């Protein structure tokens, strides 16, 4: 178990579909989640996010919140390179497979788990899904779906069913497109009458 006792709060929740998208031998799955199953049916009931939590000190019987703050990661660089390569019409497979090979460890089998280069859309979604698994909880997905597109130069994934886990677009393009920009806080507006609120938000 997590052994957090009465400390901390569970502020981050993920849909079961996301957990089930991992291969069982992908080490990132169990390093990121503690899964809970029904004792009779053995059906997944939910997950607890445990990545970057720190460690439990057996001697003091306390949880130590000492996880490293993630600033920049080599896996992130590889996946950014994959995005660039995809925009240039190149082969993204080697970058995705660099990341997968580390994640699968000794169980890595390129013929079974490796990615093969495809068309722009397939590549773009493969990069996004790999980032989902690799950069989980690191505050990047929102910016990914704003930046990445379904077709080259096309609609951002934030408005596409393909950009979500459950098939529902993150934002409704017809009614929520304004949300890709942040509002200006009320206090700032009150102090400067020349400022205008970002279109779409209440003034």
Please provide the spans of the model-predicted regions.
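N-terminal short leaders/motifs
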Residues: 12-28
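Polar, glycine-rich mid-to-C-terminal structural blocks
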Residues: 1-12, 18
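Acidic/polar-rich alpha-helix caps and helix-coil junctions
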Residues: 23-203
């Amino acid at each position: 178990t997590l052994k957090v006792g009465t400390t901390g709060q569970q502020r981050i929740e993920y849909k079961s579909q996301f957990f089930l998208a991992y291969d069982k031998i992908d080490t990132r799955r169990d390093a990121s989640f503690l899964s809970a199953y029904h004792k009779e049916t053995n059906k997944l009931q939910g997950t607890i996010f445990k990545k970057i939590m720190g460690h439990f000190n057996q001697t003091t019987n306390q949880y130590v919140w000492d996880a490293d703050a993630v600033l920049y990661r080599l896996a992130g660089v590889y996946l950014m390179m994959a995005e660039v390569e995809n925009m240039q019409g190149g082969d993204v497979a080697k970058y995705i497979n660099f990341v997968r090979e580390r994640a699968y460890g000794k169980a890595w089998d390129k013929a079974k788990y490796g990615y093969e280069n495809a068309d722009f859309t397939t590549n773009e979604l493969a990069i996004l899904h790999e980032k989902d698994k690799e950069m989980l909880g690191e505050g990047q997905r929102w910016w990914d779906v704003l930046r990445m597109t379904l077709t080259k130069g096309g609609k951002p994934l934030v408005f596409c069913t393909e950009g979500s886990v459950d098939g529902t677009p993150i934002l409704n393009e017809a009614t929520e497109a304004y949300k890709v920009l942040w509002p200006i806080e009320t206090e700032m507006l009150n102090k400067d009458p020349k400022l205008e609120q970002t279109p779409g938000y209440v003034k």
